[in-house]
Amino acid sequence: EQIPFSVAVIDMDWHLVDIPPKYGTGWTGYTWNRELFPDPPEFLAWLHEQGMKVTLNVHPADGVRAHEEAYPRMAEALGIDPAGGTAAEFDVTDRAFLEAYFDVLHHPMEEDGVDFWWVDWQQGKKTRIPGLDPLWMLNHYHYLDSTRAGGAGLTFSRYAGIGSHRYP
């Protein structure tokens, strides 16, 4: 009681983790687990009423699979036929993917009350561009995106190597 919490950090169980095996693991996810969080906007509003900012953990490496609520919008944004169920593969080097990643997946949740993201990339340092670390790029783009409304940017992440400190 009377502990001065200022940020609610919600690990990966905010999203579905027990998914059909045909979609892979539940490590990556963008659909709220309604058993644990039946009304996400209400929960986020309550945390804000308690004076807390909110960050959600995200492991984006597996892209967006067909079981996700946002899959049809993500597929459409990337020119994928949603009826086929082909995953929207994560690709930090693809401008169209990055735009959809923020516009389709993250911004709607921010409108519901998520203040910033905990980028928890653990899937290696390779992209289609040799030498370009996906975590470093994710931190860069999350930081830039967090400034779009004119405020000071903020990214919560794993250490991405030299230069990571430039993204608070």
Language model region names:
Residues 1-168:
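Catalytic-domain carbohydrate-binding cleft regions of carbohydrate-active enzymes
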